[in-house]
Amino acid sequence: MLDINLLRKDLPSAIARLETRKSPQTFLNVEAFQTLEAERKAVQIRTEELQGQRGTLSKQIGQLKSKGEDASAVMALVSHSKAELESSAKRLEQIQTEMQALLLAVPNLPHDSVPQGIGEAGNVEVRKWSPFEGLGGEPAALSFEPRDHVDVGQPLGLDFELGTKLTGSRFTVMKGPLARLHRALSQFMLDVQTAEHGYTECYVPYIVNSDSLRGTGQLPKFEEDLFAARKGGQEGQAENAALYLIPTSEVPLTNFVRDEVVPEAQLPLKFTAHTPCFRSEAGSYGRDTRGMIRQHQFDKVEMVQVVHPEKSYEALEAMTGHAEVILQKLGLPYRVMLLCTGDMGFGATKTYDLEVWLPAQSTYREISSVSNCEAFQARRLQARFKNAQGKNEFVHTLNGSGLAVGRTLVAVLENYQRADGGVDIPAVLQPYMGGMTTLSLPAA
């Protein structure tokens, strides 16, 4: 959520920065904001006047009583003043609720270093990497016609038909050594992020409440993208509250600090978790219908950092590097893209996407997204730290994939495929595979 004081101080500047997101929709209802703000000021002024009057009248009552004089008329004025004060306080609370509802639908302001643009076409390539020397980061061509991960994976245990039978479209079943390779990828990612990059591994619920999703920005704006595990009952009844399957473990991990004041000495907090993620993919009808690229259920190793505000952009670069290390150790060609204003997520101020090379498509596809949210989530979460002056200040939060496990499997199948139909197992994964070096086609 944006800092309301920033909007009060310089609304035109904030609107101009929001407009760089190049969205056809209007993010902030300026008229509604200005109307509420004007009423808030008027009610606030009247409240302060009433409080002053009440104090003056209370003194008069004391003086009259000390003289033995009748104070009933003044007491009646105090009673009336009290009723009006209560009414004003109630209206101020209502205004605050209405203002919060207005601001919850407004995305974060892009950082000044983010290029302006619309969609993927406006993104800027930062760097490329590949394991092949002398190619300037470009991928090397296979010596045979590459097959996509569906054609490579199905003979090895990738079963889309069974996933559809069990649940529906965009679900997958994996069997045998292929399922083990999928598991090996997640274990390898966790080991690197914990042992080499200092993240604390966490096990988290796969179901969260609406407060958690509101804190990280999925609610109220993106409810259609979520799978509801339980519809909400009557307000105020916790046992009947709405529950949702997590779209990413960013949600529970970031909510560790909701309503907390973290000692400054404990920053940064670095968390990682391997979880399934559940997304309805609303608005993605007809996109990536073949294979594992876009699924309703997929696994991901997530990285979350909670940092001092002065350190968040340093942390963004470091976290991007933490995701890159996974791809480098796997020997997968990739590129890093700086997202433009029109392609960034709702809560981000700046985002890097890592895109892995898929030879069958002869293109790069997103495999990780790493974002700095500054205080946007922290303000919704009321996540703070106590600074050197003893004052509470909002932390900055960052999140990123380290990596999407299914898409990494796709990249391994395509980049390590062999002409005989098998798949070479990357060297770093072989210890997790009991020493296996190859996924071979089953004997006829």
Swiss-Prot record:
Its main location: cytoplasm. GO terms for cellular component: cytoplasm. The keyword Hydrolase does not apply. Keywords: Aminoacyl-tRNA synthetase, ATP-binding, Cytoplasm, Ligase, Nucleotide-binding, Protein biosynthesis. It comes from the Bacteria. ATP binds at residues 279-281, 366-369. Pathway: Aminoacyl-tRNA biosynthesis; selenocysteinyl-tRNA(Sec) biosynthesis; L-seryl-tRNA(Sec) from L-serine and tRNA(Sec): step 1/1. Disulfide bonds: none annotated. It catalyses: tRNA(Ser) + L-serine + ATP = L-seryl-tRNA(Ser) + AMP + diphosphate + H(+); tRNA(Sec) + L-serine + ATP = L-seryl-tRNA(Sec) + AMP + diphosphate + H(+). Its EC number is 6.1.1.11. It is found in: Cytoplasm. L-serine binds at residues 248-250, 302, 401. GO terms for molecular function: ATP binding; serine-tRNA ligase activity. HAMAP family: Ser_tRNA_synth_type1. Consists of two distinct domains, a catalytic core and a N-terminal extension that is involved in tRNA binding. Homodimer. The tRNA molecule binds across the dimer. Catalyzes the attachment of serine to tRNA(Ser). Is also able to aminoacylate tRNA(Sec) with serine, to form the misacylated tRNA L-seryl-tRNA(Sec), which will be further converted into selenocysteinyl-tRNA(Sec). PANTHER family: SERINE--TRNA LIGASE, SERYL-TRNA SYNTHETASE. Belongs to the class-II aminoacyl-tRNA synthetase family. Type-1 seryl-tRNA synthetase subfamily. This is Serine--tRNA ligase. It comes from Polaromonas naphthalenivorans (strain CJ2). The lineage of its organism: Bacteria, Pseudomonadati, Pseudomonadota, Betaproteobacteria, Burkholderiales.
